[in-house]
Regions:
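N-terminal beta1-alpha1 cap of cysteine-dependent amidohydrolase-like domains
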Residues: 1-314, 319-357, 365-398
């Protein structure tokens, strides 16, 4: 939102009171603003920022620093004008020019000396140089990939740009580690409910497929059919949460011979409830805020793909689900070639599944994308991207 929005008023009043209580030496107000460029006049306009600061002053808040979003560099004349009419130092007018990638922003802010300005205004003594070698190394690999791969993202919410934002960013992190540009191809799962030929046309040119998390019946069969195709074609597969559950159902139906296997979320009366509500969820009638949320421990099976990726046997991952694999079917699926490589030690809940006779087929009940960062890319995403590059090489050699 913006300063003038009525929804912002409680927060602005809280900020005003906080600044009064802490004192100006212990509190800093940084105002992010837009400097639009008028192409007809070929000039940057400062009036919106001047009015925005005026609105902020009406709430009792004087900004200390202006961070100015812009398509073009700010001239010194514009900086002086903003400083004069917004009542800040010229050095406190920070240019935030449009960047090639969001990961450029920290270095651009360093170039504008935003860090030094903040330290000076808060009268902090610690002026150590930031250690940005790892960040710069990441940017170098991100911008100079040695090759590229295409990974299909099969989901139900692809029309919403940020629905799978964490997954997209995890691929950015993992791609940089593998010096690889990951082209994520959105595929709506409902588009995979047609003929086998249509599925083949959509998936055959991909180097890997990730089946995304989700809820509800819509698009489930499309996900299951996509998983069957990649399993049979030996294409690397990664399933997250619902994606893992769909993988279990697919193997149960087409390998273990349990043709009616389903999740009770979709078919409560199924003869083979491969995926079922967790016991502690069955008596819950109010669904708001009652899922299995947060971090839980997981123990990995030795010599599994998961253990190789993590390089350890004990991990902790974040969750958001109600349904789980039904352990009553564990023996049958193990006979079908499924490996239960990650188990919660307290509840025996299945956290990770794999397939023996497949180059890289892995599903997780947890959400690995929620822990991936630039400096610590998630090991499963790194391993998956690596598997996709190996598949690409093998395909070229054929």
């Amino acid at each position: 939102g913006i300063v003038g929005d009525i929804e912002s008023l409680p927060y602005l009043e809280s900020l005003r009171q906080l600044r009064w209580e802490l004192g100006s030496d212990n509190c800093l107000v940084i105002h992010l603003t837009l400097i639009p460029y008028l192409r007809a006049a070929k000039e940057l306009k400062t009036k919106p920022t001047q009015h925005s600061v005026k609105e902020l002053l009406n709430t009792g808040i004087q900004p200390d620093i202006l961070v100015c979003r812009s398509e073009y560099p700010l001239t010194m004349d514009i900086r002086r004008k903003l400083a004069l009419f917004c009542n800040v130092d010229v050095g406190s007018v920070i240019e935030a020019i449009d960047a090639e990638t969001i990961y450029d922003v920290p270095l651009l802010m360093l170039k504008e000396k935003l860090d030094a300005t903040v330290i000076t205004k808060l009268r902090l003594k610690d002026r150590r140089e930031p250690r940005l070698k790892a960040w710069k190394d990441f940017l170098g690999k991100l911008k100079n990939p040695t090759h590229g791969i295409r990974i299909g993202l099969v989901g139900k919410y692809n029309e919403l740009q940020d629905a799978y934002k964490s997954i997209h960013e995890s691929f950015v992190h993992a791609g940089a580690v593998n010096e690889c540009n990951v082209d994520v191809v959105p595929i709506h799962s409902e588009q995979l409910e047609g003929s086998d030929e249509e599925i083949r046309e959509r998936l055959q040119d991909l180097h890997g497929v990730l089946v995304a998390p989700g809820f509800g019946e819509r698009g489930i069969e499309g996900k299951i059919r996509a998983i069957r195709y990649v399993r049979e074609q030996q294409i690397p597969f990664f399933g997250i949460c619902l994606g893992m559950q769909c993988a279990v159902i697919e193997v149960a139906r087409h390998v273990a011979g349990l043709e009616q296997a389903a999740s009770t979320e979709v078919d409560p009366a199924t003869d083979h409830p491969i995926i079922d509500l967790m016991p502690e969820q069955k008596n819950i009638t109010k669904l708001g805020g009652t899922m299995r949320l947060g971090a839980y421990d997981c123990e990995l099976r030795r010599r599994s793909k998961a253990a190789k990726a993590y390089a350890t046997l004990k991990i902790s991952e974040r969750h958001r689900h109600r349904y789980e694999f039904n352990n009553a079917y564990k023996a049958q699926l193990e006979k079908a070639g499924m490996v239960f490589s990650g188990i919660n030690p307290q509840t025996e809940l299945v956290e990770i599944i794999e397939l023996k006779d497949h180059p890289w087929f892995l599903g997780t009940q947890f959400h690995p994308e929620l822990k991936s960062t630039v400096e610590n890319p998630h090991p499963l995403f790194v391993a998956f991207v690596h598997a996709c590059t190996e598949y690409q090489k093998a395909k070229k050699d054929q």
